[in-house]
Amino acid sequence: MKYQAKNTALSQATDCIVLGVYENNKFSKSFNEIDQLTQGYLNDLVKSGELTGKLAQTVLLRDLQGLSAKRLLIVGCGKKGELTERQYKQIIQAVLKTLKETNTREVISYLTEIELKDRDLYWNIRFAIETIEHTNYQFDHFKSQKAETSVLESFIFNTDCAQAQQAISHANAISSGIKAARDIANMPPNICNPAYLAEQAKNLAENSTALSLKVVDEEEMAKLGMNAYLAVSKGSENRAYMSVLTFNNAPDKNAKPIVLVGKGLTFDAGGISLKPAADMDEMKYDMCGAASVFGTMKTIAQLNLPLNVIGVLAGCENLPDGNAYRPGDILTTMNGLTVEVLNTDAEGRLVLCDTLTYVERFEPELVIDVATLTGACVVALGQHNSGLVSTDNNLANALLQAATETTDKAWRLPLSEEYQEQLKSPFADLANIGGRWGGAITAGAFLSNFTKKYRWAHLDIAGTAWLQGANKGATGRPVSLLTQFLINQVK
């Protein structure tokens, strides 16, 4: 899809003009101009009750005298001054549905005139593009009959302000990164294993002059003492690989990097602590943290942000066999702390703890890890907010700000010292689980023991990384949040 921002005349020929209208006869400048061009036709529709402005209601008009456009699509925007982000998304999706049904190839949108609460034109355009790209996404790689795709080729926003051009640039890059994250996450686990994840990182680095790649294999992990990471991998024939993508683009090449760490369990059966069979297929999504870091690295390379950023994809697979690690095992982690394994299905934190120690070598400005870590986070926050745990208030607030700006929502959970009590073991420095209560928090508390040398935040995306039911599939979250956070570091 090609997106443009430019001033257009209402008399310009096009497949379709999209126009927003509020309830209670609150009309925009363009509405009144079109009404004049069509000799009062739009006001006649209002008087007859056919055009109410009700939220996401669409009225499609064809071949209107006075307009060169083939069609005029009017969409209801609810009450003026009360339009929320969620309602705006409904409007965009309603418009997109009609455009697809009418095989529209080019559209000129006057939705730039819509007023959103606490949002500017930049946000209006960027969010519209991200919504369009997200809604149009199809994953039919393995279907013999491909899904019908939209023929829409050109989407023109009626404005020529500089904000609009930046919004298009950001939205295109972020949408590309989200798509990349969704594509990898939706791949079946018989194809997307740790080696596949490393191969995708290699392809990304080879296609970008700004990115370089180092892959750490099991032999190197063993030399480094990454015993917790390796223990998780022991039950699988697919070997573990940790892919380290480096984006070195700050004016000062020696500036401390921001490090993103993504949990990459390409399939998690739970190991010896085997998961229930129901919905186990969804455990291919246990690598969505790595997928989101991959998508974010792709995005920032496309945007050419003047930052130094390192993205680590911690690829691994957790399966049961005669060589698998067991409940009761005690592991010596890379930083020397010992961990008693009480549940082999609490494996993500074991992979992450060694990865978080590994990244100390980069002397990072800060580290953010992203993981589908706990079902407890889904119980606590549902599927709308990612869980945020951090030892640094400024970092946590910056991530929450980015979440608000993008509507890629997050909610901060507490991390007081009392939660460490639940992780005590009579036989080791730590237990890998902290009991039934506060599971999302105790998982974060566990990780905090391996982050003493830098500013750190943890995003638990177990509830937000994928959807179930009819719309089953990866969401690409939190690529938008992470990218916005990085954009804000430049400002």
Curated annotation (Swiss-Prot):
Cofactor binding, per record: Binds 2 manganese ions per subunit.
Binding, Mn(2+) 1: D268, D345, E347
Compartments, as annotated in UniProt: Cytoplasm
Keywords on record: Aminopeptidase, Cytoplasm, Hydrolase, Manganese, Metal-binding, Protease
EC number(s) on file: 3.4.11.1, 3.4.11.10
Chief localisation class: cytoplasm
BP GO terms, sorted: proteolysis
UniProt binding sites for Mn(2+) 2: K263, D268, D286, E347
UniProt-recorded Gene Ontology molecular function terms: aminopeptidase activity; manganese ion binding; metalloaminopeptidase activity
Disulfide bonds: none
Organism superkingdom: Bacteria
GO cellular-component term (any): cytoplasm
InterPro entries recorded: Leucine_aapep/pepB, Macro_dom-like, Peptidase_M17_C, Peptidase_M17_leu_NH2_pept, Peptidase_M17_N
CDD domains: Peptidase_M17 (cd00433)
PROSITE patterns with a match to the protein in the record: CYTOSOL_AP
SUPFAM superfamilies registered for this protein in UniProt: Macro domain-like (SSF52949), Zn-dependent exopeptidases (SSF53187)
Cofactor or coenzyme needed: Mn(2+)
Active site: K275, R349
Catalytic activity from the UniProt record: Release of an N-terminal amino acid, Xaa-|-Yaa-, in which Xaa is preferably Leu, but may be other amino acids including Pro although not Arg or Lys, and Yaa may be Pro. Amino acid amides and methyl esters are also readily hydrolyzed, but rates on arylamides are exceedingly low; Release of an N-terminal amino acid, preferentially leucine, but not glutamic or aspartic acids
NCBIfam families, per database record: PRK00913.1-2, PRK00913.1-4, PRK00913.2-4
Task performed by this protein: Presumably involved in the processing and regular turnover of intracellular proteins. Catalyzes the removal of unsubstituted N-terminal amino acids from various peptides.
Family statement drawn from the similarity comment of this UniProt entry: Belongs to the peptidase M17 family.
UniProt xrefs under PANTHER family: CYTOSOL AMINOPEPTIDASE, LEUCINE AMINOPEPTIDASE-RELATED
The name this protein goes by in its record: Cytosol aminopeptidase
Phylogenetic placement of the source organism: Bacteria, Pseudomonadati, Pseudomonadota, Gammaproteobacteria, Pasteurellales
